[in-house]
Amino acid sequence: MAQIVFSPSDLAPGDHRSKSLDLSPLTFDRIRSTRDPLFELAYGYLWKEFGAKDEMELRETLDRRFQLASQMRYEMILVRRHDEFVAVRDHTAIMSRDGTQAIVHLSHNLVAPAARRTGLAGWMRALPLTTARECLKEHKAAPGTRITLVAEMEYPTDDDHSRLIRLKAYERAGFRKIDPAFVHYFQPDFRDPVEIDKSGGPVPLPFQLVVRRVGREHERVISGAETRRLAQALYDIYSPQFRPGDLAHPLLALERYPQDTALIHLLPPTQ
């Protein structure tokens, strides 16, 4: 596994103040297996933050995802200062079905309160580019093949301050959201299958897609075809952990998306 390369050019346009952060006191460990000695530590931090909100996968799910390295690259990155927790994130890189771009699903990102507003968050948003490039190399992609980072984010509400802070941070960094007035993206139902069946069937949840199209951050529209590729990649990442019937829900059908030639606005995430 390659070492992480901290290249300032990988930082999002609005994250360049992160260049001044001294990273030398920090250790960045990449985790690619549930058998990694650091997995339980990293997973524990993520579960404590996101598990109670039903926003974190079970160990068994992640173990299966780790084992699909030939199809997708899932990893965690744990950041520590000596033995002190500083940050942790996880993400998955996968090639689009047509091979035109590497797509990285940004899953979870947790920075300790003492490390916030130091510039570290900017690097945590940029680190998945290393995984994307490894994915491109693994699939022998042509030089210059595009990379897109994509996150599923809840819609902004006035009563959820932490959500608004998170959206504002991505907005300042230069991420944009695909206009939800035209693209109605839904995340599959993550509940236990027994619970899904007891409740009468899956209930996909609405999310907005927030993206960083690396090298194209200045563009303010995205095509229907590219939008569909992004959503398909997310569903391809999820598919091994879901029953086919649950993924066949009408709200997850990509036929609902705008036609390939349509141009969809890229908006500020808080809008």
Predicted regions and their residues:
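Terminal substrate-recognition subdomain of acyl/acetyltransferases
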Residues: M1-T34, K140-Q271
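Conserved acetyl-CoA-binding loop-helix of GNAT-fold acetyltransferases
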Residues: V111, R116-H139
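Polar/charged side chains located within well-ordered beta-strands of beta-rich proteins
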Residues: E75, R89, N109, R125-P128, ...
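Amphipathic alpha-helical segments that form well-ordered structural scaffolds
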Residues: L41, Y45, L127, K168-R172
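Short, well-structured alpha-helical interface segments that form or flank functional binding sites
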Residues: P37, Q101, G119, W123, ...
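Alpha-helix boundary/capping detector
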Residues: M72, A132, I196-D197
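Short loop segments at secondary-structure junctions
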Residues: H82-D83, A114-A115, R213-E217
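A conserved beta-strand-loop-helix scaffold within acyl/acetyltransferase catalytic domains
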Residues: F28, R32-S33, F39-P113, C135
